[in-house]
Amino acid sequence: YGHPCVFATPGLLALSMLDDSIKTVVCPGISTQDCLYADLRFDPASGGIQSFDATEYLLYDKVVDPSSHVVIYQIGMVGNLGLPTNKINFEALNFIKKKLIELYKKEKKAVIYEAALYPGTHPKISEFDLEQLDRQELTTLSTLYIPPDKIQRMPSSDALRLLNQVA
């Protein structure tokens, strides 16, 4: 699997360097995100979705809406600013865990997900309590998925009034 524009900075950089005399076509492919929706069986339109690269989330104080689906890619590489390595940066991972536990309860269920690499193989889907994030078996392919908190989903009273006026 793989999409040429998803976690593919070198390819996008190469495309940006081409001049207009070279015609290029970027064909879509199936990404981890597509596999995630199918394997975990959820619709991102239900509650919305937020997705972040783990290191981007760590560095730039991204705001998470707990009422939406949250996907944090490359959680096993968080804090790695160099070449991919199988060594986990537990200090960075624990920092993310702390940020997430401030938003969710410690026992909030989350999933470590890895899409199947080849046809006929199975994805890795491991459910756990968020407070156990630093105890999960992670690789460079690991994605963290946190389902939405239904309790926090409250429709806007102004929008409801508007819709009642329109209908």
Q: Where do the language-model regions lie?
A:
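Beta-strand/loop-alpha-helix module characteristic of Rossmann-like adenine-cofactor folds
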Residues: A8-L18, I22-A167
